[in-house]
Amino acid sequence: MTEKRRIACFFTAGYTELNAMKAFMRKINDTVEYIQLCPIGPRKSRSAIQNRHIDRIDKNQNGMTGEKLIQFVLDFIKEKRFEEEGYDALLIEDDKDNRFLSIEENGIAYIDENRWKCFKDGVAECIRERYPSIPVIFFYAAPEVEAWFLADWENSFGSVYKNTFTTQQNDYFSVKFRKYVNDCILTDRYKNCIEKYGYFEGKYRKLSEEIQDVLERIDFLGDYMPELEHPIISYSKKIQGEDMLERIEPKVILHNCTFFFKEGYWALQAF
């Protein structure tokens, strides 16, 4: 039996990605083995290693993103371990956040494809100084993984609270919250081009924080059952984020995330 090719995976070190990102990648290409090198849990005991669901991120990696993540990759490939373990490709997954955008005079952003290409070329060149032939896959969530959730609503915010709400409550919440997201968070500027989010009048708004804030401030069931008690919800990257990353379907996301996600999707599927 032919052994699966091995991909060294360096994911942005957040709790959404910790336990669920490999499974998400397998939905795109299940013919390879994904070795997660970042983020990992603390190495304290055999039982912790045997526990497939990790509760905490190693303190040296926690929150690693952007330049720190890239530097971690470049340092890791210099270790003897990387050479000995024999990887066939390298995958870097990160939140794009407010990078690789240029701001127009009206304060709205557009994707700076040249800046994105220069970034990838620079990182790949550093990696290939040591491993000239290794493929490097850049899989960036633009602006954050929450964009993927919004792109596949039915498998994310449309269903993640089903165990908290009744069926009727969930249906009402899903419709109301989706309308609010489109009208007030994404707005007409970005609801059809979510990967360009989120400069408004030259100031950047972080998508995950906007979602967390509105779910804390607004009771979307208040006008549905104002005189009755109903569950109060919130959004946590560690809880709902991980759950939704396990649920969402890459093929659905492709329809709405047509630049950064599409590039990573096809590169991974073709490997």
Language-model segments: which ranges?
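C-terminal accessory helical subdomains adjacent to catalytic cores in phosphodiester-
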Residues: T2-R5, N19-H53, D58, F72-F271
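Conserved beta-strand elements of the Class I
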Residues: I7-F10
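Short acidic, Gly/Ser-rich segments with clustered Asp/Glu that frequently serve as metal-coordination loops
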Residues: A13-L18
